[in-house]
Amino acid sequence: MASSLMSNAATTMAAATTTAQANMVAPFNGLKSISAFPVTRKNNDITSVASNGGRVQCMQVWPPLGMKKFETLSYLPPLSEESLLKEVQYLLNNGWVPCLEFEPTHGFVYREHGNTPGYYDGRYWTMWKLPMFGCTDPSQVVAELEEAKKAYPEAFIRIIGFDNVRQVQCVSFIAYKPASYGA
């Protein structure tokens, strides 16, 4: 009996050793000689430099005076109601909670109380009511936007999409600019 236990243990040990040896990596043999790689000589004259061709002639710079831009979608023309409904539907399709915020005086980041970023530099807007948890219809959000426009006709109003699982703001865009802004 003792001999049969001994042979079973030896067989098990031998099987474990062979599988361990099969999984081992080959030993390191050193670096290969660099002369084995092909050598290319590059010509560093002006013709080998990357070029964007003639596109430089048609590029324009956004005029920085009197035409401030804000956030996502601000370089597009004002959104029609149909486009606005599609954007809000996108928020809802992604499972984000729509929320309206407004800023009565500045619709952009500004530094009034210092030269370093902080709370009072235009990043934090006033929330319009509460986030619209459970909202499934984009027209509900647009109705709230219209109500906010009536209450604050001279304010900038934006719609944000808030992910309540990750607890982050995923998207934000200006939905209304006051008529006095003129852009």
Swiss-Prot record:
Q: Which UniProt keywords apply?
A: Calvin cycle, Carbon dioxide fixation, Chloroplast, Photorespiration, Photosynthesis, Plastid, Transit peptide
Superkingdom per UniProt: Eukaryota
Q: Which GO terms describe its biological process?
A: photorespiration; reductive pentose-phosphate cycle
Instruction: Give induction info.
Output: Expressed at intermediate levels.
GO MF annotations in UniProt: ribulose-bisphosphate carboxylase activity
Boundaries of the annotated transit peptide in chain numbering: 1-57
Where is it mostly found?
A: plastid
Disulfide pairings: none
Query: Which Gene Ontology terms of cellular component type are present?
Result: chloroplast
Role description: RuBisCO catalyzes two reactions: the carboxylation of D-ribulose 1,5-bisphosphate, the primary event in carbon dioxide fixation, as well as the oxidative fragmentation of the pentose substrate. Both reactions occur simultaneously and in competition at the same active site. Although the small subunit is not catalytic it is essential for maximal activity.
Quaternary state and partners of this protein?
Answer: Heterohexadecamer of 8 large and 8 small subunits.
Record PANTHER family: RIBULOSE BISPHOSPHATE CARBOXYLASE SMALL CHAIN 1, CHLOROPLASTIC (PTHR31262), RIBULOSE BISPHOSPHATE CARBOXYLASE SMALL SUBUNIT 1A, CHLOROPLASTIC-RELATED (PTHR31262:SF10)
- Leftover remarks: The basic functional RuBisCO is composed of a large chain homodimer in a 'head-to-tail' conformation. In form I RuBisCO this homodimer is arranged in a barrel-like tetramer with the small subunits forming a tetrameric 'cap' on each end of the 'barrel'.
Q: Which family does it belong to?
A: Belongs to the RuBisCO small chain family.
* Official protein name in the record: Ribulose bisphosphate carboxylase small subunit, chloroplastic 4
- What is the organism field in this record? Mesembryanthemum crystallinum (Common ice plant)
Gene designation: RBCS4
